[in-house]
Amino acid sequence: GVEAQVLSNSLNTMIDKINELLEQVKTEQIRLRKAEFELLQSQINPHFLYNTLDAIVWLAEAGEQKKVVSMVGSLSDFFRISLNQGQDILDVKEELQHVRSYLEIQQMRYQDILQYEICVPEELNHYQIPKITLQPLVENALYHGIKNKRGKGMIRIEGELDGEDCILRITDNGKGMTPERLEQVREGIRNRNVRETDIYGLYNVNERIRLNFGENYGITITSTYGEGTCVTVRLPQY
């Protein structure tokens, strides 16, 4: 009698717990799909595409054939990886190729103000990363950091191992953020209801990393006004 009752109660508790977990998984899957869909929408960004095509036409008219070929190749690579046959997770190596294509295009457009370096050790190449993690971070560095400063700006992408975790850093020597603005951005990255477009891109990147790999992973930001900004991406061994 009593033992059967205890067993029955335990089973009921366990079933409740399983249902709760299933509900949680379902909710997280929906959030992940939503984040991925919104990301894809942002990738098919008409401004970026039109501006790049404009630049290609301008180069062609100026007789810069080599640059035209190079830019068309970069644009093609950029969209090929963006739309990567529905795969949501890539190797770091492929993700770096994607962001390199983006930077090659932007460097041709902003050659007076943009330099970049990608320095990531090969041992990180096989780590897994949600597709289109780095490009939105680099875009932010360009449009909010580099374009708002005087003179030439530098964007660096570096990588290292921290224990078994993969660390990727995107650093710019742009305008940087005031402490108040930095706090706003950090809050926005954690807030599902963030409305500000500039912060939403960062929230989306962080959300997809956390939903794929867990709460211990994602992005963190440091910034000094007048000196620049650094975004750190942490990924697990997968």
Regions found by a protein language model. Give the residues of each.
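Two-component histidine phosphotransfer core
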Residues: G1-T222, G228-T232
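C-terminal beta-strand of the catalytic ATP-binding
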Residues: V233-Y238
